């Protein structure tokens, strides 16, 4: 009786874990379909990096402290670069 109960509970636990993993994969695949292609994301990342570093360099040339430009959308300026938060 105990062995059967343990087997049933083990199967139930495996089923729950498998279902959860499948749902996560499905959600990730939907996000990938809706989002931008990787090449466009790379271009956006490079643009943010360039934008942030150039703005800091311009401010340094004017003998002012570098007031880092705020990066938007989960990014912040650090070491003259936009980094993902």
Curated annotation (Swiss-Prot):
Keyword Acetylation: no
Keyword Signal: yes
Annotated localization: Secreted
Keywords: Disulfide bond, Neurotoxin, Postsynaptic neurotoxin, Secreted, Signal, Toxin
SUPFAM superfamilies listed in its UniProt record: omega toxin-like
GO CC entries: extracellular region; host cell postsynaptic membrane
Annotated propeptide span(s): 23-48
Pfam families per record: Toxin_20 (PF08089)
UniProt tissue specificity: Expressed by the venom gland.
Cysteines joined through disulfide linkages: 52-66, 56-77, 71-82
InterPro entries: Hwtx-2-like
Signal peptide residue numbers: 1-22
GO MF term list: toxin activity
Function noted in UniProt: Neurotoxin active on both insects and mammals.
Similarity comment: Belongs to the neurotoxin 12 (Hwtx-2) family. 02 (Hwtx-2) subfamily.
Subunit structure: Monomer.
This protein's name: U4-theraphotoxin-Hhn1a
């Amino acid at each position: 009786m105990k062995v059967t109960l343990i087997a049933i509970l083990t199967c139930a636990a495996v089923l729950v874990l498998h279902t959860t993993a499948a749902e996560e994969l499905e959600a990730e695949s939907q996000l990938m379909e809706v989002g931008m292609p990787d090449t466009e994301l790379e271009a956006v990342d490079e643009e943010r990096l360039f934008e942030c570093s150039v703005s800091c360099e311009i401010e340094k040339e004017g003998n002012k402290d570098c007031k880092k430009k705020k990066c938007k959308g989960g990014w912040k300026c650090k070491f003259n670069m936009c980094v993902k938060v």
